[in-house]
């Protein structure tokens, strides 16, 4: 086996194309904190590092735990190919977990969120092959990422806006996870009503943070168009290729952040710089580009 093959297999193990979206989710929380006070760049960076390290830990632990199942159903993965020893994955997962907690330890509240994410990773890893309800801890892992970024950069209480972006990420992640599970079981396809309803629920949840006496959902809905158009395109292509559709849904996660952040910059009293709006599309493009190198699933 070549070194290039081993590195490609490792990049696939850690689901490299999804890392930009993880960083973007955490950054969205830090950006939200910056609306009330100047952003604390070192705290934002450590929060992003914590989120990414925990994500790496989760993927390594998942592939270690599922190695026997993968030998039968995903033989192209690194452990069935015997590119690495299973113990090396477990050791690296533990190291990433501890590093993820350590980088969040400067703030007790962000440490609590990081520890919660790690706990959810363990629950998901143990249950995802046996229960469809495992999509909930997976969704909560995503939902807690903006909270990690917010609490690392702010000593203020959790705001309704933070809860809404967390809820939007929860809905999107649970939706795509349910679709991914059903595509491996042809007799359990989700209904068309669900396929069309869940992206709308995500968009409405994002925009609900901005509805007030002067701005209604009618004024705000264009900001959700990038997310909605991409997601509905992914759902359309899902009928031709489950792999393509699910990969597109994963790449589109930063567009949830974008739909949430754009109205802040458009507000007359906005303190959110337009430059902050560059992060979600950059994460989206980077993630989609990385999918050409290794798979996102």
Language-model features: where?
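N-terminal, positively charged, Ser/Thr/Ala/Gly-biased leader segments
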Residues: 2-27
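Select subsegments of transmembrane alpha-helices in polytopic membrane proteins
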Residues: 12-21, 85-94, 133, 137-138, ...
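Divalent metal-coordination and catalytic microenvironments
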Residues: 14, 66, 258
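Multi-pass membrane catalytic core of lipid/isoprenoid biosynthesis enzymes
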Residues: 49-50, 67-121, 139, 161-167, ...
């Amino acid at each position: 086996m070549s070194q290039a093959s081993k590195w490609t297999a490792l990049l696939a193990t850690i689901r490299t194309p999804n890392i930009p979206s993880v960083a973007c989710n955490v950054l969205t929380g830090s950006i939200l904190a910056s609306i009330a006070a100047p952003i604390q760049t070192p705290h934002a960076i450590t929060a992003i590092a914590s989120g990414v390290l925990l994500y790496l830990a989760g993927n390594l632990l998942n592939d270690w735990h599922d190695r026997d199942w993968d030998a039968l159903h995903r033989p192209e993965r690194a452990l069935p190919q015997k590119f690495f020893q299973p113990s090396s994955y477990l050791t690296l997962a533990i190291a990433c977990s501890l590093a993820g907690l350590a980088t969040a330890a400067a703030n007790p509240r962000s440490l609590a969120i990081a520890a919660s994410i790690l706990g959810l990773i363990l629950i998901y890893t143990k249950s995802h092959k046996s229960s469809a309800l495992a999509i909930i801890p997976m969704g909560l892992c995503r939902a807690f990422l903006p909270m990690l970024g917010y609490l690392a950069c702010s000593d203020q209480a959790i705001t309704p806006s933070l809860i809404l972006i967390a809820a939007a990420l929860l809905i999107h992640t649970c939706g795509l996870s349910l679709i991914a599970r059903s595509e491996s079981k042809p007799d359990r396809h989700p209904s068309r009503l669900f396929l069309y309803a869940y992206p709308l629920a995500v968009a409405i949840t994002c925009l609900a943070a901005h509805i007030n006496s002067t701005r209604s959902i009618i004024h705000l809905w264009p900001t959700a168009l990038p997310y909605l158009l991409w997601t509905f395109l992914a759902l359309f292509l899902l009928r031709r290729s489950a792999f393509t559709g699910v990969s597109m849904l994963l790449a589109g996660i930063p567009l949830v952040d974008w739909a949430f952040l754009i109205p802040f910059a458009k507000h007359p009293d906005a303190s959110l710089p337009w430059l902050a709006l560059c992060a979600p599309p950059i994460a989206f493009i980077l993630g989609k580009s990385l999918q050409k190198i290794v798979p996102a699933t």
